[in-house]
Amino acid sequence: MITIYSEKHRLRNAKTELFGGLLVPPYENPSRADIVLERVNSEKLGEVIAPREFGMEPVLALHDAEFVEFLQVAWEEWSQTEYEGEAIPTCWPGRRMSQRRPDYIDGKVGYYGFSSETSISEGTWEAALASKDVALTGAELLLKANETGMSISTPLNANSTQGVFSLCRPPGHHAAFDMFGGYCFLNNAAIAAQWLRDNGIERVAILDVDFHHGNGTQDIFYDRQDVLYLSLHGDPRDAFPHFSGYSDETGQDAGVGATFNCPLPPGTQFKTWCDKFKECLAKIDQFDTEVLVVSLGVDTFEKDPISFFKLKSDDFLSIGKLIADLKRPTLFVMEGGYDIKELGINVVNVLQGFED
C-alpha cells in the first residue's frame, strides 16, 4: 500500500493545550506522524511518497471563504498583539448572543474556534494546507488506479482491493464548514471526498472509526445525499465533542438518512463495537458506494489517554479485514490516536489487515 506523507506536518508544533484546567503539552504533536511513518517503513507496507500541491480550490469547495482567510492570517494577527502565548479560544458566541464576527483577533479566534484545547500556533496554516494535499494526493492516486486498473496494493492480484494511506497531520474530522477545534483546521477526509465527487465518483462514503465523533464531517455533508457519513464513537453525553454525534442526528433536507451515528458507552469492548461496525459496513454496501474514505482514528485503543473504549491491538487487524471485505477502493485518512507507544502498531495493523 502506498503511503502519502509530508514533512511539513512538523510546522504544526503547538506548545500548549488546555486540558483538565491546566495548560499542558498537546497530545497531538509531531511525534505521532513520526511513529506511524516508522512503523510503515519497518513493516515494509509499501512506497512512501510526497504529496503534490492542489491549491485552494478544493478547500474553498467545502469551507467558508472567510473562515479560510482567517486561518491563513490568524497567527500573523495574533503575533502582532501583546499576547505572549498561542492563540487559544476563550470566548464564544453562545446561546442568545450575537453571531457577528469581531474585528479583534482574540474575538475572531473564539468566533471560529469551538473548543479551547486547540491553539493556533506558528506554522499551523502551512501544516494544515499540506495535510489536505496529503489527503488529495491519496484520492487522486486511488482514482487513477480505479480508472486504469493499475494495482497500487499488495498482494498484486486481480482480487486485491485497492487501498491508499494518507498520513495526514494535523487531523481534520472535527473541522466544520466554518469552525476549527479538536486539533483540526481543514477537514482532510471531507475535502478528499468532495474532490472525488467533483472528479466523477457519484457515491462516496466516509466511515469514521475515530473515538471522537467527526462533528466537522457531519456538519459539511448533513444536508446532502451523495456522500454517506457513518461514525462509531464515544457517546457525546460522556465524550468530546459533546454536542454532536447523537443517534437521532440522521441528516436534514435532501440529506435525511445519509448520516448514521453509533454512539457507544464508556468501557465498550471490541465485540460490542464490532457489532455496530458491521451495521455501518452493511449500510456502505447498500449505498452502492463507489469509493470509501476511512477517517482512521485509533484512539479507540484501550490505553489511549483521551478515550474510554477498550479495543486491543489485534482488533485493529480485524477492522482492516472487515473493511477489505467490502471490496471498494479505499482511502485511509489519518485522524486521531494518542497512545504514542502503540500508535504505529495500531494504525499499521488496520492497513495490513486490509491488505492480507
Give the location of each predicted region:
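HDAC/HDAC-like amidohydrolase catalytic core signature
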Residues: 1-207, 212-356
